[in-house]
Design a protein with these regions (language model features):
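Conserved CoA-thioester-binding segment of acyl-CoA-metabolizing enzymes
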Residues: 1-54, 95-96, 356-358
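Short, flexible helix-coil linker/hinge segments at the edges of structured domains or between repeats
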Residues: 75, 79-83, 127-130, 135-159, ...
């Protein structure tokens, strides 16, 4: 069996290479367990001063979870007693990483999505290359942005946070630096030079001092931010998404369907679980007041609900397995959504709009 996770120690830096290029490094259960095993070993190794997450393919850092494997072996496997076993283990890994005792560095390139973001977003230093396509597309799969990433999405301006969280649209390297999701934006040709400096610095420094020295070196390679899709369309994002309810977002889009930008997003949102869209809309505001660990715990609760009622099964089947893009959602429109159920799931008494209007 091919090693999808390859650990390597270079002087005092432990490197975890993701090595499943055929699936764009999509994470399966064995990969998640292997990463945890390596990290625990290195955390207790005095010779290791820092850990680097990297990929052996330029096409992706990590495209998220292996959805086909997840669907077959967990969601549709009646023998599996714990259908949430994959997520519970993955989320515990992400919480462990968030509290890791040694400096963590991540190399974002190509596709960076879902579980790959969860694996790396709490790194002490994130290096982004120009090829990055960063996104949390979970609403198209019958659930919501998970692995604690809404803790970060909630820090974005309201309109952009909904654009990313509800519509699942991506961010580019310049966006990631601009909104403090990544620390440096470099040309791919400079990456090895920066890592060589990391290796040299790890011989002298450790902990926070090592990261501060690495940040100084990184500034030498930091590229000027470029105009991105988000920049070019920011006025439209504000116009359609800077709203106090999902109903208002829909209304704004409906009134501007002659705009191709609005039409495309409107059609996408209408094809998704309206219940989960309402959950994500409210979750954006809720996560502003939660810690990362609390956000992860909430994510697991929402995912368990999505598994129990079949929303995730239908979403993955539609988008990944059968590719008919018809998820058979019970809630065909916002009017079908029981907001009491949304509030109960999130543990809130009032929606954002209800709280705002008090």
């Amino acid at each position: 069996m091919k090693d999808f996770i390859i650990p390597k120690v270079i002087n005092r830096v432990g490197v975890i290479y993701l090595n499943n290029p055929r699936k764009l490094n999509a994470l399966n259960f064995e990969m998640i367990k292997k990463i945890r095993e390596i990290l625990e070993k290195w955390e207790d190794d005095e010779n290791i001063k820092a850990v680097l997450f990297d990929s052996l393919t330029d096409k992706a850092f990590c495209s998220g979870g292996d959805l086909k494997d997840l669907y077959k072996n967990y969601i549709k496997n009646d023998i599996c007693q714990r259908k949430n076993e994959f997520f519970a283990t993955e989320f515990e890994l992400d919480k462990y990483i968030a509290s890791y005792k040694k400096p963590l560095i991540s190399h974002w390139k190509g596709i960076v999505m879902g579980g790959g973001i969860g694996l790396s977003i709490n790194s002490d230093y994130i290096i982004s290359e120009e090829s990055v396509n960063w996104a949390m597309p979970e609403t198209s799969l019958g659930f919501v942005p998970d692995v604690g990433v809404c803790n970060y999405i909630s820090r974005l301006p309201k309109a952009l946070g909904h654009f990313v969280g509800l519509a699942g649209r991506g961010l580019e390297a310049s966006d990631l630096v601009k909104y403090n999701f990544s620390h440096v934006y470099i040309d791919s040709k400079d990456y090895e030079k920066l890592i060589e400096k990391l290796i040299d610095l790890s011989e002298i420094y450790e902990g926070e001092e090592l990261i501060e020295k690495l940040k100084i070196e990184g500034e030498k390679y930091n590229l000027p931010v470029k105009e991105t899709f988000v920049d070019k369309n920011y006025d439209k994002i504000e116009k359609y998404f800077n709203k106090d309810s999902l109903e208002e977002i829909y209304k704004s889009l409906e009134e501007n369907l002659e705009d191709e930008f609005a039409r495309e997003i409107y059609d996408d949102l209408k094809s998704r679980s309206q219940f989960m869209l309402q959950v994500q809309f409210e979750k954006y505001f809720l996560c502003k007041n939660l810690t990362y660990h609390e956000t992860v715990d909430l994510d697991l609760k929402v995912l368990n609900h999505a598994l129990d009622v079949g929303k995730m099964e239908k979403g993955i089947r539609s988008k990944v397995i059968d590719k008919d893009y018809e998820p058979e959602c019970k809630e065909k429109s916002l009017e079908d959504v029981d907001m009491g159920e949304v509030k109960n799931l999130l543990g809130i008494e009032k929606t954002y709009k209800e709280r705002k209007n008090i």
